Amino acid sequence: MKTITIPKITPSGELDKIFDTLPLHTIGCCNWPVEFPYTPKAGFKLFHDGKCLYIKFIVTEDDIKASVTEDQGRTWTDPCVEFFVSPEGNLDYYNFECTCTGKLLLAWHPADATTEAAGKEVLDSVKRTPSLGTEPFGLREGEHSWSVIEVIPATALFRSGVESFDGKKMTANFYKCGDELPTPHFLSWNPIEWKEPSFHRPEQFGELVFE
C-alpha cells in the first residue's frame, strides 16, 4: 500500500506558487496493460489547511475532447482525473471525478453498494480551476497538457461528519481515465488487481496521512 503524508499549509497568494514547492505523485499504474496499454503522463500534488484539501492534477496526453457540459454528467468519458477517498479507511467511500474543463461527478458509496449523489450545494462547494477553461470543445488531436486544481472542503464528505482534515488518516486512490477518447486508458496511483478496469475498489486504496 502506498502512503502519502499531506502537509498542512495555510494558503496565501497564488495556489500555484504553493504547488510549485510540493512533490508530484505519479498516476502511473497501468493495471490492464494487454487491453489498455496507453499510459499518458498524469500526476497530482496536494496539501491541506485543516478545513480544505487542495489537489492539483497535471496531465499530458494525446487527443482530448470536452463533451460533458454539466456536473454529475458522464465525466469518465472525457479526459478525467479522479480522487476516491474513504474517510474511515473502510469500504465506505466518495468519488470525486473531474473533467479537463472542471465538470464534477461526486457521490457517496456506502459499503451496502447503494449510491447517493451529492446535491448542488455540495458540488458548488468544491472549487475547480481548469487550465483549459470551462467551455466544451470537440476533438483536439495531438499532444496536449492540462491541469485542474480542486479545493475540497471537509464538508464535501457530506455523509461522514468530517469537520477538519487535521491529524486524520484516510484511505484513497487517484486515477486518470478517458473511456471515450481515441485511446481509452485506466491508470491509478495505488495498484489495482482486478480482472477488468474498475476504480471502485476501496479495499485496494492507498493511505493518506494528514499533518
Label for each model-derived stretch:
Residues 1-211:
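Structural preference for beta-rich elements and adjacent junctions enriched in aromatics
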